[in-house]
């Protein structure tokens, strides 16, 4: 290990671990210009000898199941309770990770040929053993697969100041938490029921407030509560007073059928849900101020809604959109819609992001953005050094809302 902590002669001692805890993990040190070495650590609770044989490191976009190579395990420093692994990344990287200690080697170790599908299945089998990094000073959270994960923000990563209170564990005292109300949507068209949340960030002119629909709303309401950051940006004048509708999509089977290019879902939203929401929380009906925002399948759904109902949804915020759907390696359904003329005649305001470490999504996003620009839409596109990861989505979601609603806050800017 190259980190200066491993040059000490008391590695693994209680004072050494106390020093590690004060600094926080992973240990981060600059190497060459714009790059940093990250050293991940895990302390074996059984001491220098135990039944733990591997501590797998699942870093989104670096060592996770989407990567072509073999999974990576920390290695024990001989004669100590210290397990460690290091890598080097560009300074703009941001990502989440978890540690998975297990009592046996993986079945694929020693095999000459790697079976990607077999490795994916193996990952799923060990996910229940995942744990967040107890030495990471920032608050952990439940990721999309229900895993406890921790986050890393390298020094040059885009700023996320609005999330500082969450990272420091202060979200329970954040402004805006009391303005989030939960309801239940019973859909006759879809034949199902789910929770939804409505957040209000101000009441000065209720009928003029814009509306934002956030897909995967249960994540933004509970796992990564967005109410405080939104309220904070509103109070700073960066966002207008608004209504936010957070729609639950946590059922994986329903999510896979409702979000990818499903007209019934969006007709149900327009015919059943939005009239109820307007009764609970009055807001403007103008398409130009209505945003649909989502990630992954939700990112696909957001752009699908805007292209097919531009008279209702004039803005789309799409992050890591699954534009390859329904089959990887072929032009997706949205490309077919654009070929058929969708998106022409009514310019949209679009904010699209993709991660540099999610190759299929990145390739499809670049191709789709080119087509959308040819149609003349007002479009902001960003590529982020990260994987398929809510840790950077949360910052881009706020940035996108600020950008899309900028005419409402500073019409002359």
Residue spans for each PLM region:
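Aromatic-rich carbohydrate-binding modules that target alpha-glucans
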Residues: 31-92, 102-168, 188
